[in-house]
Every structure is written in C-alpha cells, then in structure tokens.
C-alpha cells in the first residue's frame, strides 16, 4: 500500500453544526483530529493555528460546514493538518 505523506481531504463539519451552539469551534477541531487519526492511524495530530482560526472566522458558534485540509506526515504516526489553499 502506498504511504500517505501529503494528502488533501475535505472534512464535512455538518454534524457539528447541527449540535449545540456553544463551543462549536472547539468540537470541530476535536472532530478534525479524530477523523485524521482514524484515516492515517496516527497517535498524535497537530492542528495548524491558521486552520483553527479559519474554522471559526465568523465567531465560535458560526463555523463553516466543510473545510479542505492538507495532511502532512512529520514523523512516524505524527501528522500535521494545515488549511489547503485553493489553486486555479
């Protein structure tokens, strides 16, 4: 199987949006960590601060519904999640 060193994925945050209004951005960051850990079998997931800020750009209770991220492998079972920049 091919090793996933640099991988781009879209994470749907709609389930987080349907939940309780308070603390949505914090739950979204935890959800992103959980999804990346599940897909890449990671022990540690590091979230870029720019990604955390872009999730809650309209406030902590008004998060985006989908987010495109790039997952990069730092070391064995340690991954960095960054915001993907659209290129056209």
UniProtKB/Swiss-Prot annotation:
It holds the Pfam family Ribosomal_L31e. This is Large ribosomal subunit protein eL31. Keywords: Ribonucleoprotein, Ribosomal protein. Coiled coil: none annotated. The gene is rpl31e. It comes from Saccharolobus solfataricus (strain ATCC 35092 / DSM 1617 / JCM 11322 / P2) (Sulfolobus solfataricus). The keyword Ribosomal protein applies. One of its GO terms (cellular component) is ribosome. Belongs to the eukaryotic ribosomal protein eL31 family. The keyword Ribosomal protein applies. It comes from the Archaea. GO terms for molecular function: structural constituent of ribosome. Gene3D superfamilies: 3.10.440.10. One of its GO terms (biological process) is translation.
């Amino acid at each position: 199987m091919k090793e996933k060193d640099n991988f781009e994925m879209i994470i749907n945050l709609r389930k987080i949006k349907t939940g309780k209004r308070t603390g949505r951005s914090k739950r979204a960051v935890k959800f992103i960590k959980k999804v990346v850990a599940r897909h890449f079998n990671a022990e540690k997931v590091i979230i870029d601060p720019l990604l955390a800020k872009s999730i809650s750009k309209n406030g902590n209770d008004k998060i985006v519904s989908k987010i495109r991220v790039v997952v990069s492998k730092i070391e064995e079972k340690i991954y960095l999640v960054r915001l993907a920049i659209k290129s056209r």
